[in-house]
């Protein structure tokens, strides 16, 4: 599969206004998304990875084939992504665990209670993204992509067995809109508090949500517009997808400037 993308930087003061504009454009309320993102680095050469390890025995055949193709394709940084809710963070318990929030704001009153987060029940998926293609004539970022379901819980042992070592982790928070075949994600990266790192591996407990800090100190967000093309070799489908992104860029030009990203800034190769 191929992923075609455009990006824009959104100042913090423009965030709420853009949410409203996107809601009107897509005729839908934003779907709030909160994710743990674990970064792993390949340390084993391609072709040496055995995906039939431990808990991976529970994976279905199709998922296992997809996983094997990704992990044996080259030496890359890859991300393991797990959905969470604010209730999972210490100090913000919730009986529903529903990650959707209204557009009125993201702030919640802190609570002194502990979270109900269970690391052993945390679902995961592996997301592979290749370095964007070089020399593309179209003014969009295009790259190979794939994803596969992983076993729940502690994912470190299977990833190590597959030739990947844990590097770091962070949280992504944002809102998703869908316009026809375009997935629009207005988001920011949140970092864990300094000194809160557990032993070298993913956290088993999450800190209070209020303790997370934005990576971008100005508080700005990133607007990402993406289309997934199943057959990247079909030039007509790729052109059509690009035109759809250009159409969105035109619709939003009074608010933001959507453009392709610098190729090397999205380089996922493990050197």
From Swiss-Prot:
GO BP, sorted A to Z: regulation of transcription by RNA polymerase II; termination of RNA polymerase II transcription
MF terms in GO: transcription coregulator activity
Pfam families noted in UniProt: Med18
Any single GO CC term annotated in Swiss-Prot or TrEMBL for this entry: mediator complex
Domain of life: Eukaryota
Keywords on record: Activator, Nucleus, Transcription, Transcription regulation
Primary localization: nucleus
Renumbered residue ranges of the record's region Disordered: 89-119
Location in or out of the cell: Nucleus
Complex formation: Component of the Mediator complex.
Reported function: Component of the Mediator complex, a coactivator involved in the regulated transcription of nearly all RNA polymerase II-dependent genes. Mediator functions as a bridge to convey information from gene-specific regulatory proteins to the basal RNA polymerase II transcription machinery. Mediator is recruited to promoters by direct interactions with regulatory proteins and serves as a scaffold for the assembly of a functional preinitiation complex with RNA polymerase II and the general transcription factors.
Family under the similarity heading: Belongs to the Mediator complex subunit 18 family.
Name of this chain's protein: Mediator of RNA polymerase II transcription subunit 18
This protein's encoding gene: srb5
